[in-house]
UniProtKB/Swiss-Prot annotation:
Domain SMP-LTD: 165-382
Protein name: Maintenance of mitochondrial morphology protein 1
Cytoplasmic side: 103-412
Organism: Candida tropicalis (strain ATCC MYA-3404 / T1) (Yeast)
Region (Disordered): 389-412
Gene Ontology CC annotations of this record: endoplasmic reticulum membrane; ERMES complex
Amino acid sequence: MTKELIKTEASDHVIQPNNEQFSILEQLKKQQEELLQKQRELFLQDQLAHHQQQQQQQQQQLQFQQQNQLQPANNWTFTQGLVLGQISVIFIIIVFVKFFVFADSSTIPTKKSSIDASGIIVKRNKLTKKDGTSDDIIEDEKLLDTRHKISTILEKTYYDVNNHSPESLDWFNVLVAQTISQLRSEALLGDNIYHSLNDFLENTNIPEFIDKINLTEIDIGDDFPIFSNCRIKYGEDLGRLEAKIDVDLSDTLTLGISTKLLLNQPRPLTAILPVSLAVSIVRFSGCLTVSLINTKDIDLKNIEKDGQENDGSNNENEDGGGTALMFSFSPDYRLEFVVKSLIGSRAKLQDVPKISSLIESKLRTWFIERCVEPRFQVVRLPSLWPRTKNTREPINKKTSVSRSDSGTSENL
């Protein structure tokens, strides 16, 4: 009995570790199965990822092939592209220079109008005549435009025509005196004034009963005119600014002539009457009106036509337009003459009043018809634009510079 009991216990003892091993083996199997399952899953994932990569590569290759089929193959190198770019730039420059800088002469229009310069010249106070506008309205617009220009000039020069005090013009007197002095020197140089007046008298048509006229006395004076009391006024009727200047000249300007009156009745040279005359201007004073005008002015043309002279003077209204200086004297001027006359050879008549009054009347009429208001004189002004042919340089400056250069060279 004891042996059997011992065997049963021993058998139980032997069986029990086998069960534990079995459980351990089962766990190991489960773990192996789990590992195998994980390895299979990882392998499947790797296969799937590899398959996806292959599909992406195939798609990229297909896209690249499609792009290559759509776009032509570009086999240009960098050097070839650079050369092509330089050639294209040079070609563009040549085309620009040819067609934009050097234009063809045949394409340049020969006729130019004021409209071509409308985009270049800044025009202010522009007047345009519209269709259907009467001449009176145009004249009113021009008058308003002129008044606006004058008011702008006075405003920008800070000059009040009503309250500004008169100016003395001392500086202007000096310039006029220098000019007159130079003219006198040129007139007296080589007896130029004598020859000029003598040629004028010889070429003048004189009546048959007057013999040759000879010059006996010429005096161009030694004094100068004095300008003073200058004031700027606005001419309401003319629509322009005028300078009113008082002029005073006290000098002696004398011209003496001698001739003979020929009595040709009843036969030629029946009698000869010598005549000697000397006319002197001793005093002149008056108010001088000076203004700048345009020779294309309509009022100026009408006045010139109405006051056209018969002495062969040139018609300035036929010339082109431009700036001119207009001057005239007021009717209340003062002009004094001294006329000396001597008639006869043996029994002489000296200073005949009738002859003096006749000569003085003729001279006053000549002056009134030309320079007294409403008549005026128009002097066209030359172009003041700087030109090379009018450029001068003092010679003394060059000599002084050369001397200074020579002195410096000697010092060196």
